Amino acid sequence: PAPSKGGNQKRRQVLLIPALAVVTGLLIGAIIILLTTEEVYAGFRTSFGAGMSAVWNSVAKAYGALFAGAFGNPVRMVQALFSGDALEIRRAFNPFLESLVVSTPYIFAGLAVALGFRAGLFNIGVEGQLFMGATAATFVGYALKGLPAVIHMPLAMLAGAIGGGLWGFIPGWLKAKTGGHEVINTIMLNWIAFRLTDWLLNGPMQRPNSGGVPISPIIEKSAQIPQFFGSPIRFHLGFFIALGIAWLVYW
């Protein structure tokens, strides 16, 4: 059957809303750049043309650095591919692949928010649930020794799911039993999770001889998600796991 008008409109909204969010963010960022760049003021004091030139140069320079850091330098990527040097190729593509690594927990967090929306709940507590899930997974990842990877890695993932799930259970229970609004409760629990994680990383879970840096002990190799490339690229299987779960949620 032909797609319905409502279905087409929904698909357009799915594409349009994120695009508008990105454009709005870029515009707001550009305004902040202009308001905080001395060269722009100096240019307009000279002439309107000089000011507009300074506006373009400032925004282009800032966003050029932003996109190069997030996606890599296209020229360097092409040169690296033609050079055939494996290390140079890894270095050239590392910014883009690192962005995928960083995006992985955000994909999971977004799915958690989406599921709450589908259930009619406004879950602002995903940040705190992410903190507690990561803390639980980290503890299992470094505290358990001598386990094979086939057991240790899934166990760490399970610990993360349980940690985040239990933290999300608290506002759910409060809403069911007392009628407490999930928005208020989850916002407060976000701060509790943040402060608790900060205390743990500066105390019981702090890496020995870290020089006061709030960082956990090194996670056992058996608990780490497999990586596809050598150093300095950290790109790992978790990104494709996130995409797979996103497809399941959509389905």
Language-model features, listed with the residues they occupy:
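Cytosolic juxtamembrane amphipathic/interface segments immediately preceding
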Residues: 1-14, 85-93
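Transmembrane helix-bundle core of multi-pass membrane transporters
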Residues: 65, 74, 79-80, 186, ...
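Short loop segments and helix-boundary regions at transmembrane helix junctions
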Residues: 8-16, 117-125, 147-211, 251
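Hydrophobic core segments of alpha-helical transmembrane domains in multi-pass membrane transport
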Residues: 17-34, 109-113, 134, 138-140, ...
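Helix-boundary and loop/linker segments of multi-pass membrane transporters
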Residues: 7, 87-88, 145-149, 230-233
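Interfacial/capping segments of alpha-helical transmembrane domains
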Residues: 28-81, 204-215
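Residue-level signature of transmembrane alpha-helical entry/exit and packing/kink sites
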Residues: 10, 14-18, 22, 94, ...
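Single transmembrane alpha-helix segments in multi-pass membrane proteins
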Residues: 33-38, 61-143, 157, 165-169, ...
